[in-house]
Design a protein with these regions (language model features):
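Catalytic phosphate/metal-binding cores of nucleic-acid and nucleotide-processing enzymes, i.e., regions
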Residues: 1-105
Length: 105
């Protein structure tokens, strides 16, 4: 499975689970190294860098993942072989108690 096929599979899963996510399109108008998907589930921010099974993150991608982790978010490189484990993790996070954040409601 190539990275594009895997990305489609992950996005379909996020849509099925009604997970808020944004697909980042790399290019001249965007800062380089931003993870492929920025997501929020049950108050948890996480960033996904999607790779084919033999893919490797660039140093800039690794730098941005580390910055997200240092800021309290979850950031990971996700490979197809980890997808089932990731799906289970998301389903568990959806069942966590909702954080008591102040809102403007």
């Amino acid at each position: 499975m190539n990275e594009r096929q895997f990305q489609k599979q992950v996005i379909n899963f996020l849509n099925e689970q009604e997970i808020y996510h944004i697909k980042i399109w790399g290019g001249g108008f965007q800062r380089a190294g931003i993870p492929d998907l920025l997501c929020c589930v049950n108050g948890l921010f996480f960033a996904l860098e999607l790779k084919a099974e033999n893919g490797k993150a660039t140093p800039l991608q690794m730098y941005n993942l580390q910055k997200i982790k240092k800021s309290g978010g979850l950031a990971m490189i996700l490979y197809p072989s980890q997808f089932n484990q990731f799906k289970q993790f998301i389903k568990e996070v959806k069942n966590w108690p909702k954080p008591n954040f102040p809102t403007q409601e």
